[in-house]
From Swiss-Prot:
Stored PANTHER family: PQQA PEPTIDE CYCLASE (PTHR11228:SF7), RADICAL SAM DOMAIN PROTEIN (PTHR11228)
EC number: 1.21.98.4
Species of the source: Acinetobacter baylyi (strain ATCC 33305 / BD413 / ADP1)
Record note on cofactor: Binds 1 [4Fe-4S] cluster. The cluster is coordinated with 3 cysteines and an exchangeable S-adenosyl-L-methionine.
Protein name: PqqA peptide cyclase
Pathway(s) of this molecule: Cofactor biosynthesis; pyrroloquinoline quinone biosynthesis
Recorded catalytic activity of this chain's protein: [PQQ precursor protein] + S-adenosyl-L-methionine = E-Y cross-linked-[PQQ precursor protein] + 5'-deoxyadenosine + L-methionine + H(+)
Binding site for [4Fe-4S] cluster: 23, 27, 30
Cofactor(s) demanded: [4Fe-4S] cluster
The keyword RNA-binding is annotated on this UniProt entry: no
Length: 386
């Protein structure tokens, strides 16, 4: 494979540390793998520190602490402090469950730069159904205010889907009431548990149009009243005609280390039929530069038609490899989101099906250890029959 030297020599600028798959919530759109409960061993404090040292030596500058719920790691303050001392810009991506004012103060003292808190909905009732926690909504509100009190920008994330998209006005009103600085309205992308629940979660075309119009109206309101809140609406792939560049370019910017030490180009890459090395077996630098899995989709030599001759191939790099594999079972295929894909009709059909289906929220398969273990058992039983 001909990999351009310019791509080989670029360091991963963004390191995502998935500290744990453990989580107190059970969101049906979680991007964690379905069989996450099969992961029994997490990297130790010293192993994570070694990962951070290696990444920083390569040139990584931003470090995200994620999960699962990273607050469940008892060594989180220690890891934040160590990453700060190495010179990382650090970001905590959290549900807010388990967060306290004391912990926020500890994290601030340790050098944490940024905190993002996720919400499920704009009201306690729907939040409880989606998260599985009766107290989650009030806790998130309190911690969003506490983050602001400790002089962090308030950054909120709402995953938008069929069951909460019509709350878009109330979601934005809640964000304004909390005086949020940044609000990410991230329409559900279908990986992990979200893919399992796609038929229930995918919004209708009318819902998408409504949400886009309301966000634009609120942006105008915010400008007219000189408010500081910034609204970012992330459109779903399934309502695009051209694919997005896979994670900013496969093996170009982003690197993920899973709780067990598996090193990935993105969080969903485990779904691909590739062998991904672990940090216990090879150095991060060796994995980034030499592992076949990281070089598999660098450059454009790997592309099949219609990508190979497409004038946009350097712009979108063929789209998302995980999405291509999920829908075609060919990881080299054109992302079916692209209208030039020979199976783009699958995307169109998924949109149309939303207009003739009426899913109930009880249809959702929740992300919890019981369901994960059941999925793992079924997958193991299927493998034993091969």
């Amino acid at each position: 494979m001909n990999i351009p030297v310019s791509l080989q020599s670029k360091p991963p600028l963004w390191l995502l540390a998935e500290l744990t798959y453990r989580c107190p919530l059970q969101c049906a759109y979680c991007s964690n793998p379905l069989d996450y409960a099969a992961v029994k061993q997490e990297l130790s404090t010293d192993e994570w520190k070694d990962v951070f040292r290696q990444a920083r030596a390569m040139g990584s500058v931003q470090l995200g602490f994620s999960g699962g719920e990273p607050l469940l790691r008892q060594d989180l303050s220690e890891l934040i402090k160590y990453a700060h001392e190495l010179g990382f810009y650090t970001n905590l991506i959290t549900s807010g469950i388990g967060l306290t004012e004391q912990k926020i103060a500890e994290f601030s003292e340790a050098g944490l730069d940024h905190i993002q808190i996720s919400f499920q909905a704009s009201d306690p009732a729907l939040s409880e159904i989606l998260s599985g926690s009766r107290k989650a909504f009030q806790q998130k509100q309190a911690m969003a205010l506490a983050v602001k009190k400790h002089r962090y920008p308030m950054v909120l994330n709402f995953v938008i889907h069929r069951f909460n998209i019509e709350q878009i006005d109330q979601i934005i009103e809640l964000s304004l009431e909390l005086n949020a600085d940044y609000v990410e309205l991230a329409t559900c992308q279908f990986y992990g548990w979200a893919k399992l629940n796609q038929a229930a979660l995918l919004p209708t075309p009318e819902q998408i149009s409504y949400a886009q119009a309301r966000v634009q109206a609120y942006r105008q309101y915010i400008d007219q009243h000189h408010l500081k809140t910034k609204l970012l609406l992330v459109a779903p792939d399934y309502y695009q005609e051209r694919p997005k560049k896979c994670i900013g370019g496969w093996g170009q910017i982003f690197i993920t280390v899973s709780p067990d030490g598996t090193v990935l180009p993105c969080q969903s890459a485990k779904d691909l039929p590739l062998e991904f090395p672990t940090i216990q077996d090879q150095s991060l630098k060796t994995i980034w530069n030499e592992a076949f899995a990281f070089n598999a989709f660098r450059g454009t030599d790997w592309m099949q038609e219609p990508c190979r001759s497409c004038p946009d191939k350097d712009k979108d790099l063929g789209g998302c490899r995980c999405q291509a594999y999920m829908l075609t079972k060919n990881m080299y295929a054109t992302d079916p989101v692209c209208s030039k894909s020979p199976v783009h009709h699958q995307i169109v059909e998924a949109r149309l099906q939303t207009q003739c289906s009426k899913p109930d929220i009880s249809d959702l398969k929740l992300r919890n250890p019981q369901n994960s273990k059941l999925f793992f058992k079924r997958a193991s039983d299927a493998d034993s029959l091969l």
